[in-house]
Structure formats: structure tokens, C-alpha cells
Amino acid sequence: MIGFEIFLAIGMFTAIVLGLVAIILVARAKLVSSGDVTIQINGEHSLTVPAGGKLLQTLATNNVFLSSACGGGGTCAQCKCVVVEGGGEMLPTEESHFTRRQAKEGWRLSCQTPVKQDMQIRVPEEVFGVKKWECTVESNPNVATFIKELTLRLPDGESVDFRAGGYVQLECPPHVVEYKDFDIQPEYRGDWDKFNMWRYVSKVDETVIRAYSMANYPEEQGVVKFNIRIASPPPGSDLPPGQMSSWVFNLKPGDKVTVYGPFGEFFAKDTEAEMVFIGGGAGMAPMRSHIFDQLRRLKSNRKISFWYGARSLREAFYTEEYDQLQAENPNFQWHLALSDPQPEDNWTGLTGFIHNVLFENYLKDHPAPEDCEFYMCGPPMMNAAVIKMLTDLGVERENILLDDFGG
């Protein structure tokens, strides 16, 4: 009798285990996609791809590159597309990025959308003009204490067909980078020593993608140029250093960098309105692209001014280029303001934060600031202060154009 009970118990246990295995297999078949699916794009292009990944990465694998400044983290909301069919329900991570109307129209973040079944999607047509290059580092010097000017040489015969104010994405591989190995010119090492920046180490286990505005303008061909600020941890924090910027700061001439692009929406309006450019820090990049494009390529007669804020003269760069542009173009003026000029600067020019300088020295006496177009790129606090000042002056939001790299 005891032996029978033992066999019965073993049999029941085995049956339960087999039943659970069957349930798991059925659930897996329903929840985990496998095999190939078809993605129809804009009703014209068709891809046959393996199921199971996210839409953003699946498209990129097939050379269809949607913009993604956060590299697929679901925070930048640049990888938007319309999912006409397939893709399942919108995820909670997507909801804050869309209005109810957009949600009903099928807008999704491609980085959050699973590829589980046949799909129909719509993307901007310009996506099909996006290309991928393996570029070579031509130079990577400091132009300010915490900003590098990275210049990449494109492969022979290649060019980036971009508009001024556009950007590309850089791909950073897994790496271990030690700040003590950075090549920082002697004139910029003081603050690196002061804040003991050399102690940081960047460890990255997977590929990272980030977006950067180009500092060159369309006629500067064969290269792409960037102004990239190191994203070091705030003092006293346990946060890791910036993944992409740490890798960029360690790049040397001859190194290879993968680039995708071009992308963009921070473009100049085709009008005759006065243009006022406002920049700070690494926000110099799209300012340079726009201003050089207007004056060198388009030979614009529009009234143009550029207001740039820096801490001290050591943090100001491209000054000789802007001096030359001002000398060559009577319709262009530029103004540098220092918020913390050093004794060695012997500075007699404008001082203070750039939004106050712009208001006190120009806009408060301007007959019609609401008729100007304002283009800006800089640290988030600068952007917020400038936007408030312009709004208080009656400038409509449609005439305030922002390259919001600061989030």
C-alpha cells in the first residue's frame, strides 16, 4: 500500500511538472515572437525581418535610420513613427510623449515598439536619405576647458547632404576609458587639476548612440565637425561620467567613428526677418553652422547678430572667425559676454549672463523684437532664461527656435 502511494505521488508530481511545462511552452509561443515578419514602410518599401526585437533597432539593422538622441532609451522621443498596423498597445513609457489625438493616429516611439507580427508603419520620407559612414578622426583638440572640437574625415568621395542646424548620430562601442589618459592642452589643465577630473573612469558594456549638432556648414565638405562638452559627474555625486562624451574625449587622430545621418529640424526660416542667434557653451556648434551658412553660402542680406556667453576668455572660441565675418559683412554683428572674466583677461567688453546682456544692450530699445527670429542653443538654464525674456517682450513662440540638446 505504501509503495502504491509513493508511485501515485510520483506520478501526480510528474503530471503537474509536465502540465506546467506545457503551460510555459504555450505562453512562450504566444508571448515570445519567433520566425520572420514583414514590415511595410510608407506603403512602398517592404522588409522581411526576424521577430522579437524593437522597431528602432530592427529598422537600423536594415539601413533605415530613425533619429534617436538617447540611443533607444525612450527619453528623447525623436524616434517617432506612425504604426498603422501591428505593434500592440502603446506602452506607459510612451504615453507622456503623445497627445490623445496622436495616440489615436497611431504615433509610437519606435524604440519601445516590439516587432512581434507583420506591421505597417509610416516614417518621414527624408529617413531614406540617411546614411551610415565609418569616419576617421582628423583632430580632437580642446577649444575650451571642458569642450573638444572633434573633426571627422568622411570616406573618400562621400559627403553629408545636410542643412545648417542639422545633426548626426555617433556610435560609441563598449569601452573602458580612464580620464587620466585624456589629451588636454596645458592651458586648460588647471580646472581639471582643481576638480581632480583625472580620477574618473568610464565603463560601458554595450553600444551607445548619441546625437550631436554639426558645427560645420554645408560648403565645408568632406568632414563633420562637433563641439562636445565632457559630461562629468556633479561634485559629490556617485553618478558615472557621460558614456559618449568620455569616449569622445579619448579619441585620437586616426581612430574610427561610426556616424549616421543627417537628421534635423532646427533649420532657418526662409524669410527676410532679422535673425538673432544666442548661444552658450557647446551650443556654439549649430550657431556656427547657421551663421556661416547665411553669410558664406547664401550671402544673406538679412540683419544678423550673434550673442554668445562664456565664463571667461579661455572658454570663448571661434572668436577670430566671427571677427572676420563681422569685418566682411556689414549686416552682421557679434557680441561676446563674459560672466566671470579673469584678471588675466583684461576684459573691457560686455559682462553678465547672456540673456541680461542681450536685453540691456539691444532688445529693450529694439523697436519690434516680436518681428525678429531668435535661434538659440546652450545650457538648459540659459535657454529657459532667454525664452522667458523673449516671451515677456511679446515674441511669439513660433519665432523662438531652440536646439534643445540639454533636454
Curated annotation (Swiss-Prot):
It is found in: Cell inner membrane. The gene is nqrF. The chain crosses the membrane at residues 6-26. This is Na(+)-translocating NADH-quinone reductase subunit F. It is a single-pass membrane protein. GO terms for cellular component: plasma membrane. NQR complex catalyzes the reduction of ubiquinone-1 to ubiquinol by two successive reactions, coupled with the transport of Na(+) ions from the cytoplasm to the periplasm. The first step is catalyzed by NqrF, which accepts electrons from NADH and reduces ubiquinone-1 to ubisemiquinone by a one-electron transfer pathway. Composed of six subunits; NqrA, NqrB, NqrC, NqrD, NqrE and NqrF. The lineage of its organism: Bacteria, Pseudomonadati, Pseudomonadota, Gammaproteobacteria, Pseudomonadales. Its cofactor is [2Fe-2S] cluster; FAD. [2Fe-2S] cluster binds at residues 70, 76, 79, 111. It comes from the Bacteria.
